[in-house]
Amino acid sequence: MKNMLLMSGSKYKDTAYLVHTLPWLAQFLADYKGKKVAFVPYAGVRRSFDEYETTVKNALQSLELEIVSVHRGKQHRDIIEQADVIAIGGGNTFCLLKQMYEHDLLDAIRAKVNSGTPYFGWSAGANVAGSSIMTTNDMPITYPPSFNALNLFPHQINPHFISGKMQGHNGESREERLEEFLIVNPQSLVYAMPEGTALHIQGEQATVLGAQDILCFSEKMQLDTKAVNSTFNY
């Protein structure tokens, strides 16, 4: 059974890196102390893989996990196949997915997660769990072979969702961007995840975690609000 924790971002309000996620992760990984976590660092454009690995290790030290970045393997895929848990960090979703294709990780991750290996990711790491990355917020844009992602959660995800416009901002709001996406892709569902929220996926059900509701948009911007602590079939 699929077991995934998809988190909107690495911070919430003024919290330090990944601090607000620790209670979720402690429960999610309660049976995995001392186990090996394969960490995918490809989204970290402004830091090296070594630096990203160290940052995550330090942030999650209290969970007592063995975190190993996939770049430590002769073949990056080897680390995935040896892992007890898979984690994908945030950053640039285009760079992340491009390198996942280059290192042939998508099928390996899908197979592991579909057979029950826990998966957690934040920001870009949540985005790639969805059907495609076409509702990412990111620049720079690089070109993966396809925008199709892991499709472990078979809908679109928009992390870091913020409603409305800042005063003086004359560009499109996030709602307007998603409306445009749904005009072009009317059969899609988009799960808009505000800061401080997460989806815990267990099999074919999802539970909303965090401080705010998650918004599900469909054709013509029809809204289905997924309330905090609610569980729904997706």
From Swiss-Prot:
Q: Where in the cell is it found?
A: Cytoplasm
Q: Does the keyword Mitochondrion apply?
A: no
Pfam families, alphabetized: Peptidase_S51
Signal peptide per UniProt: none
- Which Enzyme Commission number(s) are on file for it? 3.4.13.21
Q: Which GO terms describe its molecular function?
A: dipeptidase activity; serine-type peptidase activity
Q: What is its main location?
A: cytoplasm
The reaction(s) annotated as catalysed by this protein in its Swiss-Prot or TrEMBL entry are: Dipeptidase E catalyzes the hydrolysis of dipeptides Asp-|-Xaa. It does not act on peptides with N-terminal Glu, Asn or Gln, nor does it cleave isoaspartyl peptides
CDD domains assigned to the protein according to its UniProt record, in alphabetical order? GAT1_Peptidase_E
Recorded hits in InterPro entries, A to Z, give: Class_I_gatase-like, Peptidase_S51, Peptidase_S51_dipeptidase-E
This protein's UniProt keywords: Cytoplasm, Dipeptidase, Hydrolase, Protease, Serine protease
> Belongs to which family?
Belongs to the peptidase S51 family.
Q: Identify this protein by name.
A: Peptidase E
Organism the protein comes from: Actinobacillus pleuropneumoniae serotype 5b (strain L20)
